[in-house]
């Protein structure tokens, strides 16, 4: 009776272990499904930012090509800039949250952890690439706007150096150079453009500063992932090498097997021939007797 009780207890423990294993597997699958859902959402956000950056470039060109840009064009650019910042913040927060969870699970080396690291790294690099393009577009727009201001100042008879122009932009007061402009129709139009371009640059610089910390955050994250990516690449290369070696060994084995089969057939034929000759000799001997 006591032995039977022990058997039942052992069976129950085994069933409990099996149930726990199933629950862990289900939980892990659900976790990875949620992870891939976040990955897809983040990827779509980055793609949308990329689209917005291309739209912003077009609006920059329109604004630069017109002496006095339409207010609607500037409003559209403002809305686009706000949307880019909103989505970029969302992506940054998602990536940092993923990074935190990966660091917490670092002690457990598993296949899904490597997958999460790889996916996170790919998205981080893609995000930095898109934001770098946006930053380059902003800097280009600033330089070209500054060039337009410089040309308009020359039209009014005021020549300025790059250093003087930067001083005006940093002060936030275009009156430093526009206060003594001659009152004429040409000068008024030039003055209007100077003030408009100056406001564009001030707004732009505010946007660049807001995005700077975010950009550096993710750029540092990607830099830290460099070694990890190199290790992943090395592991992949080693895996490919092993596959190639295994394939070569398989070819050799097939070749040797084929050669062995041929030798076996030859031996069998020789044995059959020898047996035939032996049978013939025995037959002749019996006949003679």
UniProtKB/Swiss-Prot annotation:
Coiled coil: 32-111
Parts of the chain on the Extracellular side: 285-289
Known outcome of mutating residue 41 to G: Found in a patient with congenital cataract and developmental delay; uncertain significance
GO annotations of cellular component type: apical plasma membrane; azurophil granule; cell-cell junction; dendrite; endomembrane system; extracellular exosome; glutamatergic synapse; growth cone
Domain t-SNARE coiled-coil homology: from-to ranges: 191-253
Cytoplasmic compartment residues: 1-263
Pathological condition linked to this protein in its record: Retinal dystrophy and microvillus inclusion disease: An autosomal recessive disease characterized by early-onset, severe retinal dystrophy associated with intractable congenital diarrhea. Intestinal biopsies show loss of microvilli, microvillus inclusions, and accumulation of subapical vesicles in villus enterocytes.
Subunit-level organization: Interacts with REEP6. Interacts with PRPH2 in rod and cone photoreceptors. Interacts with ROM1. Interacts with SNAP25. Interacts with VAMP2.
Name this polypeptide is given: Syntaxin-3
Organism expressing this protein natively: Homo sapiens (Human)
Gene: STX3
């Amino acid at each position: 009776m006591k032995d039977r009780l022990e058997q039942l207890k052992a069976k129950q423990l085994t069933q409990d272990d099996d149930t726990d294993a199933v629950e862990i597997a289900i939980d892990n699958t659900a976790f990875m499904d949620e992870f891939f859902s976040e990955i897809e959402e983040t990827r779509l956000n980055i793609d949308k930012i990329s689209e917005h950056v291309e739209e912003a470039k077009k609006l920059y060109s329109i604004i630069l090509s017109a002496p006095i840009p339409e207010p609607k064009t500037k409003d559209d650019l403002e809305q686009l800039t706000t949307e880019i910042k909103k989505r970029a913040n969302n992506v940054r927060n998602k990536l940092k949250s993923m990074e935190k969870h990966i660091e917490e699970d670092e002690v457990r080396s598993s296949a899904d952890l490597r997958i999460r690291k790889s996916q996170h790294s790919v998205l981080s690099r893609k995000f930095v690439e898109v934001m770098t393009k946006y930053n380059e577009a902003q800097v280009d727009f600033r330089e070209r706007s500054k060039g337009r201001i410089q040309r308009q100042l020359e039209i009014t008879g005021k020549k300025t150096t790059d250093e003087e122009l930067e001083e005006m932009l940093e002060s936030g007061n275009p009156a430093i150079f526009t206060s003594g402009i001659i009152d004429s129709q040409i000068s008024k139009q030039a003055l209007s453009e100077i003030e408009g371009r100056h406001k564009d640059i001030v707004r732009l610089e505010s946007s660049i500063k807001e995005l700077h910390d975010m950009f550096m955050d993710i750029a540092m994250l990607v830099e830290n992932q460099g070694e990890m990516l190199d290790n992943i690449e090395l592991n992949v290369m080693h895996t490919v090498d092993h596959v190639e070696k295994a394939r070569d060994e398989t070819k050799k084995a097939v070749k040797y097997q084929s050669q062995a089969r041929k030798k076996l057939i030859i031996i069998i034929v020789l044995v059959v021939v020898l047996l035939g000759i032996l049978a013939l000799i025995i037959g002749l001997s019996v006949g003679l007797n």
